């Protein structure tokens, strides 16, 4: 029997083995026709810069659930994409001396861009949408017009505070020490003609949704949304901008572009064919079974998103789960702050499989987790090198000693096989 190497070099092994699995359709399962389709839609990252380890963790956790559901026999739609409009992208492009479209193209499709990162981390998404895609832009214009025609969007003047990094509007009373309550950064004064969505109209229905159903999880997120946003009084939401141009144009009022969060949220439906002819599986995969979202965007997905769907008379997603942050030195990883960990460097050093295992094994999903190289190394040594490595070493040694280094075909199953299969099916 060939002697195992003393040191594991992931670059020499993982890509070759993973490609072999792909070539043999090892990750494809035959859907059970008796099971309803299952859909998981990932919040599209805003493409203001290269993604970091926090994004890789977000995608990996959702990919793992997707693969598990496929193994259970579900016909799964795993949707990912990118949020490519907004003022901060326009500003970043200007500073880089390129057009906004060139800027986002490079972040998405360029070397070590988002598509490369998804490939690196073995993300098995079924579809990828860019909010600059023509079919999505046209669908958003139709959606905006319909909410306007329904009487839920009206023109006025916005005057208040705006956090450019978060693309969020705030009132003076919502600020924390005069700064954005989500990211803690400076806000700027904003005053411009704008369209507003009647968010206040749906306050009671949204509160009932949060308090009386299991729509939003965990329960701590429900208390936060109700006590911090709904009970103080929901104000109507500014849903268009006139101070910049990089966005979906409001087709019936030149000069206005659709607020980036309206644009981004509806990608979950347009990517399935809603209000467009690009795809035709909206009825099959909507409503989504689950949204996994970072806690900083729970407000958008549990208050604003349901209200707009109610306005459109569309089904609501079944569940929204607000997960914690991946922290570095006690603070949230942020592209704009520059406190990020490069997933490319980590994967080259430790391997993608070990990295995916570490992310799933180490951090409680609903809570924040503080990343460090020491924690990653200890987890790999303890669980993989020591526990799994020792098990493999002893198994190979016994196989060599007692069976001449060969594994013979086993006829039939034993009770322990049936018991194990039952346990897996009950997960």
Residue spans for each PLM region:
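Acidic, turn-prone loop/beta-hairpin segments
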Residues: 83, 403-427
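A charged helix-plus-loop insertion that forms the helical arch/lid used to bind
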Residues: 92-108
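A broadly conserved sequence feature marking short terminus-proximal activation segments
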Residues: 103-162
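Bulky hydrophobic/aromatic "packing anchor" residues in well-ordered structure
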Residues: 83, 111-114, 206
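A glycine-rich phosphate-binding loop feature that marks nucleotide/adenosyl-phosphate handling sites
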Residues: 85, 160-166, 324-326, 375, ...
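Short, charge-patterned binding micro-sites
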Residues: 82-88
